[in-house]
């Protein structure tokens, strides 16, 4: 998971458009074959839900593979996964490589017949490259491997030192980490912050982000080990809701929808002091508010550990160049590529050798006050334990984000919104 954009993907998203595109492509292919003028250039389209930091790598790959032309399609997180599902259903319209976020990987790996089994293209020889649980997350029920892992989202808290200072709180990252061993302690710090905060500044950005971080530390959370939805019966999910609501009702939240334009503006204007911060969030903050360099630092996450996000590169079977697509995906997820992306964007590698390497452990991010981000996030990633994920993980996450927003916008009470959330979960799952 990484910088999310709202740019619509410039490709067909309806069945009619897909069928028209197929007809045009077939006619063009027939004409080029008949004339003998068909180009040897292979165009590979890569479908992403944000900036993965691949642009320099594309150029490098094209230089060493002169017959390959790479095009990138970017759209918002929910639209990307929704449209991918549609394209798979109709058998056309998918890109040669499609990214899938961990919240949706269970949904797509339940349809392995729609993806290339990467084991048949040699991926088995790469298995030890990844954390064991990361490799396993994209294994389909029939044993097929449908994706190559990109990053993992081990957690921390990114905070504005200048705003902490104005509120009379410590600014040193070690001292700040000690303020909140638990999420309840985090809310208590928020209460202190609000008493002395600069006008218009809130302690955290969005209740949904706090809730998601707490959920990321649970196992099980939304699903049990048998794949049953347990949202309503898991007391830890309700406890996560309750502690989040304390911050929301305590007016500690800016009440922003994550990845919205208002949220992006909040980074620029400094309207919130903390954000739950998976490793990939570093690149997002840098991209949204470059002029805040040096004002941010990174502390430990309350509760310790947890993983929020991380993605995979898949190869839909409907593509015309599946072998070439796999080769590109293999390059983009190679150790050298993932190490490069980490230093450029903060997306944490999902490969143990890299997580233990001096290149990662010794890396400090100047934007975040030279925080030892490799050490902070890398050490956490090595201790991560996979969470049980189900086919509607992403849908449930969307439903709870909407539920929290209803409370933040004073449309429903916490109790009524929770009950509505449970109804919504039942409807989608």
Q: Which role fits each region the language model picked out?
A:
Residues 1-44, 423-429:
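Short, low-complexity disordered leader/linker segments with a strong preference
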Residues 40-51, 68-73, 96-97, 146, ...:
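Short, well-ordered beta-strand elements
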Residues 59-130, 147, 165-168, 265-266, ...:
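Extracytoplasmic "Venus flytrap"/periplasmic binding protein-like
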Residues 102-156, 184, 295-297, 363-364, ...:
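Hinge/lid segment of periplasmic solute-binding proteins
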Residues 144-151, 155, 165, 182-230, ...:
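Extracytoplasmic/periplasmic solute-binding protein
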Residues 187-191, 227-257, 286:
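Glycine-centered hinge/linker elements that transmit conformational signals in sensory
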Residues 246-250, 287-348, 353, 409:
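Extracytoplasmic/periplasmic substrate-recognition and gating elements
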Residues 368-424:
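C-terminal capping/gating helix-and-loop segments adjacent to ligand/active sites or protein-protein/ligand interfaces
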């Amino acid at each position: 998971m990484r910088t999310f954009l709202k740019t619509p993907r410039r490709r067909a998203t309806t069945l009619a458009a897909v069928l028209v595109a197929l007809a045009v492509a077939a006619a063009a292919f027939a004409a080029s074959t008949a004339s003998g003028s068909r180009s040897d250039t292979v165009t590979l389209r890569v479908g992403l839900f944000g900036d993965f930091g691949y642009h320099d790598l594309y150029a490098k790959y094209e230089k060493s593979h002169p017959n390959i032309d790479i095009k990138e399609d970017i759209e918002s997180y929910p639209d990307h996964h929704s449209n991918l599902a549609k394209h798979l259903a109709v058998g056309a319209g998918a890109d040669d490589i499609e990214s899938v976020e961990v919240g949706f990987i269970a949904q797509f790996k339940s349809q392995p017949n729609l993806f290339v089994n990467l084991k048949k293209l040699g991926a088995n020889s790469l298995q030890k490259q990844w954390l064991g649980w990361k490799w396993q997350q994209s294994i389909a029920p029939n044993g097929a491997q449908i994706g190559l892992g990109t990053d993992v989202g081990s957690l921390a808290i990114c905070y504005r030192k200048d705003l902490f200072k104005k509120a009379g709180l410590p600014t040193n990252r070690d001292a700040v980490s000690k303020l909140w061993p638990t999420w309840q302690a985090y809310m208590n710090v928020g209460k202190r912050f609000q008493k002395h905060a600069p006008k218009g500044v809130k302690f955290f950005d969005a209740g949904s982000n706090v809730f998601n971080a707490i959920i990321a530390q649970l196992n099980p959370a939304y699903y049990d080990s048998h794949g049953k939805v347990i949202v309503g019966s898991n007391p830890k999910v309700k406890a996560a809701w309750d502690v989040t609501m304390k911050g929301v009702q305590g007016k500690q939240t800016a009440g922003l929808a994550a990845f919205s334009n208002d949220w992006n503006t909040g980074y620029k204007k400094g309207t919130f002091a903390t954000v739950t911060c998976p490793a990939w969030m570093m690149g997002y903050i840098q991209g949204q508010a470059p002029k805040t360099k040096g004002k941010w630092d990174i502390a430990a996450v309350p509760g310790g550990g947890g993983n929020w996000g991380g993605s995979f590169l898949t190869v839909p079977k409907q593509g015309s160049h599946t072998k070439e697509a796999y080769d590109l995906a293999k390059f983009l997820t190679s150790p050298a590529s993932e190490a490069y992306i980490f230093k450029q964007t903060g997306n944490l590698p999902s490969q143990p050798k890299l997580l233990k390497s001096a290149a990662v452990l010794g890396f400090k991010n100047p934007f975040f006050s030279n925080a030892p981000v490799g050490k902070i996030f890398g050490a956490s990633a090595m201790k991560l334990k996979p969470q049980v994920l189900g086919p509607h993980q992403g849908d449930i996450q969307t439903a709870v984000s909407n539920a929290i927003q209803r409370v933040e916008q004073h449309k429903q009470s916490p109790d009524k919104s929770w009950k509505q959330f449970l109804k919504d979960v039942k409807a989608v799952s």
